[in-house]
Amino acid sequence: AGMDAALQAWGPLGEYLVDAAQRTILFWDVLRRRSDQYQEQKARAVPHVLSFGAELVLDGRTFEHPANYLLVRIIPPAGVVIDPKKRPFVVVDPRAGHGPGIGGFKADSELGVAMRAGHPSYFVGFTPDPMPGQTIEDIMRVEAVFLEKVIALHPEAEGKPCVIGNCQAGWAVMMVAAVRPELFGPLIIPGSPLSY
């Protein structure tokens, strides 16, 4: 009660000081939480923020020309029925971060929408550090093998995989499509910088 009376005596300035103090505490708490999340992600061998279960299909680190990329099959959530004859979808994680963002961090992501429509869905992600001497050409080779594997897993599909490459992943898969066009169905490249 004594503090309230003191603040009331200050009038609007007192209200402002209380508000500023509360907002400052909330701001620092948000930064602390973000730091905790960062440390948790950094401690993972393969950090991601996929909201779907996944199982490893291929690990590009084991290839003749290794790259730090991995292909996983996305496990559909309960109640979602996948039709193996529908065109598979492959979402490639953008290189500019360590999470799928629009690709797969929630039900209304690219993966979520594809699975709700009954499509088998895959995700290409990567580890934080490249393999020693890794080049974009190595990544292209690995991504081509990934697409060959998806095609082999769905021999009765209505078409070749629909590949979605967000941001940097878009121009990377465009390079693969330029040399291996037979591996691709539709190619979607949202936010990909191709006009430099």
Named regions from a protein language model:
Residues 1-196:
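N-terminal cap/leader regions of alpha/beta-hydrolase-fold enzymes
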